[in-house]
Amino acid sequence: HAKEKFGYKKIVLGGWSGGGSLSLFYQDQATGTRLKHTAAGDPYDLSKAELPAADAILLLAAHVSRAVTLTEWMDPSISDESAPFTRETELNIYDPENPNKAPYEAAYVTRYRAAQLERNRRITAWVKERLADLRATGRDNHEQAFCVHGTMADLRWADPTQDPSDRTPYTCYLGEPAVANDGPVGLARFTTLRSWLSQWSYDNSPADGLTNATRVTLPALVINNTADLACTPSHAQRLYGALGSSDKSHVDIAGADHYYIERRDLLDGAVRQVSDWLKARDFM
């Protein structure tokens, strides 16, 4: 549309936050093997869609994917989704009775991360079971909405030594992590069976920025905000490392938070970094 209707010769995808991995997913689909079914198995043939490839990509304060980010933020102390406030003390980083304290030992981090992944997979198994039940009773197009509690319990929020950066310690982009963990606003807080599989399932979401990035060979600019309270530095590092591009750049915006709310004075510099990069490649 931009090329045909408005006469643009080159198109640059710009993905901020969650838009970064989605931009990678789009470019991967535009140039590679197209999906013919959704993650839930419903027919949706993207090979019939017109998906023009972009000419470059900007990953701006981007995370690696919705599914991976959610998993890294999930509260692993919840073992029963029907009883979300019955929690295992040793895996509840907000419980003062938890004997494991920051800075966390490597063995505890490994145990915690494994429990987060296990919880994501447990929800996925339940989702697939519910979809199978619906289809078995002739309700192929029916849906079920559900709530996912405890989605702001990343060890990074309780331990500044995890993925260290310039971020304000013991907080997150939604405020106090312990409150945001169960508040009405959060990743995947309100979702559906199909939405879970497409967006939030660690094993089933096709929009996996790190996998998609390996097949993206466009010129790419990765911007990391060093005080980001959502997408910490390892997100930018992982995306940069995964990109298949021979022309790729990584730039740190020192002191910048996720939305530049605290440091509006840094926004002009970030814009200048992007525009200089684009000009150097004849995109402006």
Give residue spans per PLM region.
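Catalytic histidine-centered segment of alpha/beta-hydrolase-like enzymes
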Residues: 256-269
